[in-house]
Amino acid sequence: MDRFLYYPLSLMPYLVITLIVSFTMHELAHAYVAYKFGDDTAKKQGRLTLNPIKHLDPFGTILILVAGFGWARPIPVNRRFFKKPRLAGVLVSIAGPVSNLILAFIGFFLLVLMHAYGMEMLAAFSTGLDQFFSIWIQLNLVLFLFNLLPLPPLDGYRIIEDLVPPGVRAKMTQAESYGFIVFLVLFVTPLGSYVLWPMLNAGRDSILKLFSAIFQPLL
């Protein structure tokens, strides 16, 4: 069975739990910020909820288990409802990745607390909890960094769209049709192994060092 999966079968329960929570919070963050700025499109579609069924894309979720990458159902956003479309657009786009950064921070904090104060009480579960928190932290950091890449249709691309002049934005909108080709090149060719993943891993490690520095007194 392991040969059909990107991750070991023994880690699947931890991975599935992490994906469900991370994808749900990511999309809910988009929906909530859009709603606060006046766009109730997602709310009307039942997306302003913690129910993961409303946010998970079946194919995208399965794909991440077998190929290492995937996606959730994107939140619909209607910019016409925003009084300040560019500002609201940036904040809506960045809300998703920030939610993953917050989840990673919470996971790191709980892991530190467990090792600092609760290891004796949790000794029987320490190995499993270590594995779970490791997956939780690293996957959320990768989601944070990956979604900030300036590639369509990722959040990083949307942020740039709202920061550039209207003329440039129009050209970026036209270029979105090439997004699938870009992702195909990154994930099917060696380019991803030599460029994308080393970059994401370096960013992840830098954030982990920052977390460690923050919690140094407890380590």
From Swiss-Prot:
Which sites bind Zn(2+)? Answer: H26, H30
The cofactor named in the record is: Zn(2+)
Q: What is its main location?
A: membrane
Question: Known EC number(s)?
Answer: 3.4.24.-
InterPro entries from the entry?
Metallopeptidase_M50B (IPR052348), Peptidase_M50 (IPR008915), S2P-M50-like (IPR044537)
A UniProt-annotated Pfam family: Peptidase_M50
The UniProt keyword set, sorted, is: Cell membrane, Hydrolase, Membrane, Metal-binding, Metalloprotease, Protease, Transmembrane, Transmembrane helix, Zinc
Q: Where is the active site?
A: E27
Biological process, per Gene Ontology: proteolysis
Task: Kindly report, in one word, the top-level EC class recorded for this enzyme.
Answer: hydrolase
Q: Which PANTHER family match?
A: ZINC METALLOPROTEASE MJ0611-RELATED (PTHR35864), ZINC METALLOPROTEASE YWHC-RELATED (PTHR35864:SF1)
| The protein's name in its UniProt record | Putative zinc metalloprotease YwhC
Question: What organism is the protein native to?
Answer: Bacillus subtilis (strain 168)
Primary gene name = ywhC
